Amino acid sequence: FHDKGGDDKSAESFSSLGILTAIADLAEHLDLVRNQEPGLRLYRARPGFKKSSPSAKDFGPPPRTVCQSNRMNPAGVPMFYGALDPRTAVKEVKEQSSQVGFFITVEPLRLLDLSRIPAVPGFFSEEPRRLRLYLSFLHYFADDIMQPVARDDRVHTEYVPSQVVTEFLREHTFEVGKLDGVVYG
Protein backbone atom coordinates (compact mmCIF):
# COMPACT_ATOMS: atom_id res chain seq x y z
CA PHE A 1 0.00 0.00 0.00
CA HIS A 2 2.93 2.31 -0.05
CA ASP A 3 6.00 3.15 -2.05
CA LYS A 4 8.92 1.36 -0.42
CA GLY A 5 11.33 3.86 -1.88
CA GLY A 6 14.31 2.43 -3.63
CA ASP A 7 14.88 2.28 -7.34
CA ASP A 8 12.26 4.29 -9.26
CA LYS A 9 12.78 1.98 -12.25
CA SER A 10 11.94 -1.14 -10.29
CA ALA A 11 8.31 -2.27 -10.61
CA GLU A 12 8.52 -3.54 -7.03
CA SER A 13 8.97 0.03 -5.75
CA PHE A 14 5.81 1.37 -7.45
CA SER A 15 2.70 2.15 -5.45
CA SER A 16 -0.58 0.58 -6.57
CA LEU A 17 -1.51 3.90 -8.18
CA GLY A 18 1.88 4.02 -9.91
CA ILE A 19 1.43 0.54 -11.35
CA LEU A 20 -2.08 1.28 -12.63
CA THR A 21 -0.88 4.57 -14.12
CA ALA A 22 2.00 2.79 -15.87
CA ILE A 23 -0.41 0.17 -17.25
CA ALA A 24 -2.77 2.90 -18.50
CA ASP A 25 0.18 4.68 -20.14
CA LEU A 26 1.23 1.42 -21.81
CA ALA A 27 -2.32 0.84 -23.07
CA GLU A 28 -2.27 4.28 -24.64
CA HIS A 29 1.21 3.71 -26.12
CA LEU A 30 -0.04 0.44 -27.67
CA ASP A 31 -3.00 2.31 -29.24
CA LEU A 32 -5.50 0.36 -27.16
CA VAL A 33 -7.19 3.69 -26.40
CA ARG A 34 -9.04 4.67 -29.53
CA ASN A 35 -11.64 7.10 -30.75
CA GLN A 36 -14.87 5.65 -32.05
CA GLU A 37 -16.80 7.79 -34.50
CA PRO A 38 -20.57 8.26 -34.04
CA GLY A 39 -22.77 5.58 -35.56
CA LEU A 40 -21.61 2.58 -33.53
CA ARG A 41 -24.50 0.17 -32.94
CA LEU A 42 -24.59 -1.28 -29.41
CA TYR A 43 -26.96 -4.10 -28.47
CA ARG A 44 -28.41 -4.84 -25.07
CA ALA A 45 -30.64 -7.74 -24.05
CA ARG A 46 -33.05 -7.61 -21.16
CA PRO A 47 -34.55 -10.81 -19.75
CA GLY A 48 -38.17 -11.48 -18.93
CA PHE A 49 -39.96 -8.43 -20.35
CA LYS A 50 -43.72 -8.39 -19.86
CA LYS A 51 -44.18 -5.42 -22.22
CA SER A 52 -44.76 -6.12 -25.89
CA SER A 53 -42.81 -3.03 -26.95
CA PRO A 54 -40.24 -1.89 -24.37
CA SER A 55 -38.80 1.63 -24.54
CA ALA A 56 -35.17 2.72 -24.82
CA LYS A 57 -35.21 3.43 -21.07
CA ASP A 58 -35.91 -0.27 -20.45
CA PHE A 59 -32.60 -1.12 -22.12
CA GLY A 60 -30.48 1.46 -20.29
CA PRO A 61 -28.53 0.87 -17.10
CA PRO A 62 -30.63 -0.05 -14.06
CA PRO A 63 -31.48 2.56 -11.41
CA ARG A 64 -28.99 2.84 -8.53
CA THR A 65 -31.51 1.35 -6.12
CA VAL A 66 -31.58 -2.02 -7.92
CA CYS A 67 -28.13 -2.04 -9.53
CA GLN A 68 -26.35 -5.29 -8.68
CA SER A 69 -22.64 -5.90 -8.32
CA ASN A 70 -20.95 -6.95 -11.57
CA ARG A 71 -17.39 -7.57 -12.66
CA MET A 72 -16.75 -3.88 -13.36
CA ASN A 73 -19.16 -2.09 -11.01
CA PRO A 74 -20.15 -2.43 -7.37
CA ALA A 75 -23.78 -2.59 -6.27
CA GLY A 76 -25.46 0.80 -6.56
CA VAL A 77 -23.12 2.08 -9.30
CA PRO A 78 -24.90 1.60 -12.63
CA MET A 79 -22.92 0.96 -15.80
CA PHE A 80 -24.10 0.27 -19.31
CA TYR A 81 -22.96 -3.11 -20.63
CA GLY A 82 -23.50 -3.29 -24.40
CA ALA A 83 -22.52 -5.79 -27.07
CA LEU A 84 -21.44 -5.33 -30.68
CA ASP A 85 -23.92 -7.96 -31.92
CA PRO A 86 -27.33 -9.25 -30.75
CA ARG A 87 -26.14 -12.82 -30.15
CA THR A 88 -23.51 -11.70 -27.65
CA ALA A 89 -26.06 -9.48 -25.90
CA VAL A 90 -28.38 -12.46 -25.41
CA LYS A 91 -25.52 -14.66 -24.16
CA GLU A 92 -24.65 -11.98 -21.57
CA VAL A 93 -28.05 -12.23 -19.85
CA LYS A 94 -28.15 -16.06 -19.96
CA GLU A 95 -31.93 -16.18 -20.33
CA GLN A 96 -33.90 -18.14 -22.89
CA SER A 97 -36.53 -15.43 -23.06
CA SER A 98 -35.12 -11.95 -23.60
CA GLN A 99 -35.69 -8.98 -25.83
CA VAL A 100 -32.88 -7.18 -27.63
CA GLY A 101 -32.68 -3.48 -28.27
CA PHE A 102 -29.95 -1.40 -29.82
CA PHE A 103 -28.52 2.07 -29.48
CA ILE A 104 -26.63 4.04 -32.11
CA THR A 105 -24.02 6.40 -30.73
CA VAL A 106 -24.43 10.04 -31.73
CA GLU A 107 -21.17 11.37 -30.30
CA PRO A 108 -17.57 10.19 -30.60
CA LEU A 109 -16.46 7.80 -27.85
CA ARG A 110 -13.04 7.18 -26.30
CA LEU A 111 -12.69 3.45 -25.75
CA LEU A 112 -10.10 1.17 -24.18
CA ASP A 113 -10.08 -1.81 -26.55
CA LEU A 114 -8.96 -4.85 -24.57
CA SER A 115 -9.72 -7.11 -27.53
CA ARG A 116 -6.51 -5.83 -29.16
CA ILE A 117 -3.97 -6.49 -26.37
CA PRO A 118 -0.76 -7.82 -27.93
CA ALA A 119 0.52 -11.23 -26.89
CA VAL A 120 2.84 -11.36 -23.90
CA PRO A 121 6.47 -11.67 -25.08
CA GLY A 122 8.09 -14.99 -24.25
CA PHE A 123 10.29 -15.52 -21.22
CA PHE A 124 13.44 -15.39 -23.36
CA SER A 125 12.34 -12.30 -25.26
CA GLU A 126 14.57 -9.24 -25.13
CA GLU A 127 11.55 -7.10 -24.26
CA PRO A 128 11.70 -5.53 -20.79
CA ARG A 129 10.34 -7.62 -17.93
CA ARG A 130 7.96 -4.79 -17.01
CA LEU A 131 6.31 -5.00 -20.45
CA ARG A 132 5.65 -8.72 -19.92
CA LEU A 133 4.19 -8.04 -16.46
CA TYR A 134 1.93 -5.22 -17.62
CA LEU A 135 0.70 -7.09 -20.69
CA SER A 136 0.00 -10.11 -18.47
CA PHE A 137 -1.99 -7.85 -16.14
CA LEU A 138 -4.06 -6.49 -19.03
CA HIS A 139 -4.78 -10.03 -20.27
CA TYR A 140 -5.78 -11.21 -16.77
CA PHE A 141 -8.02 -8.16 -16.33
CA ALA A 142 -9.70 -8.74 -19.70
CA ASP A 143 -10.21 -12.43 -18.88
CA ASP A 144 -11.56 -11.60 -15.42
CA ILE A 145 -14.23 -9.16 -16.61
CA MET A 146 -15.46 -11.73 -19.14
CA GLN A 147 -16.19 -14.36 -16.48
CA PRO A 148 -19.84 -15.14 -15.70
CA VAL A 149 -21.43 -13.09 -12.94
CA ALA A 150 -23.19 -15.00 -10.18
CA ARG A 151 -26.80 -13.96 -9.68
CA ASP A 152 -27.43 -14.81 -6.06
CA ASP A 153 -27.72 -13.01 -2.74
CA ARG A 154 -24.06 -13.39 -1.79
CA VAL A 155 -21.63 -10.49 -1.54
CA HIS A 156 -19.04 -11.21 -4.23
CA THR A 157 -15.77 -9.84 -2.90
CA GLU A 158 -13.93 -11.58 -5.76
CA TYR A 159 -15.27 -8.82 -8.04
CA VAL A 160 -13.56 -6.06 -6.03
CA PRO A 161 -10.16 -6.15 -7.82
CA SER A 162 -11.67 -5.72 -11.29
CA GLN A 163 -14.05 -3.06 -9.92
CA VAL A 164 -11.09 -1.10 -8.52
CA VAL A 165 -9.21 -1.27 -11.84
CA THR A 166 -12.36 -0.21 -13.71
CA GLU A 167 -12.86 2.75 -11.38
CA PHE A 168 -9.23 3.78 -11.90
CA LEU A 169 -9.68 3.60 -15.68
CA ARG A 170 -12.90 5.65 -15.47
CA GLU A 171 -11.14 8.41 -13.53
CA HIS A 172 -7.75 8.36 -15.29
CA THR A 173 -7.14 11.14 -17.79
CA PHE A 174 -5.48 9.70 -20.89
CA GLU A 175 -3.79 11.98 -23.44
CA VAL A 176 -7.06 12.02 -25.41
CA GLY A 177 -9.17 12.56 -22.28
CA LYS A 178 -11.23 10.31 -20.03
CA LEU A 179 -12.64 7.03 -21.30
CA ASP A 180 -16.26 6.54 -22.23
CA GLY A 181 -16.07 2.76 -22.19
CA VAL A 182 -14.16 -0.50 -22.41
CA VAL A 183 -14.35 -3.00 -25.28
CA TYR A 184 -13.60 -6.63 -24.50
CA GLY A 185 -14.34 -9.97 -26.02
Which residue ranges define each predicted feature?
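Conserved structured core elements
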Residues: A83-R87, Y159
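A short, exposed loop/beta-hairpin motif centered on an aromatic-Gly-Thr core
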Residues: G76-G82
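Active-site and NAD+-binding cores of ADP-ribose-processing enzymes
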Residues: F1-G39, R44-N73, S97-G185
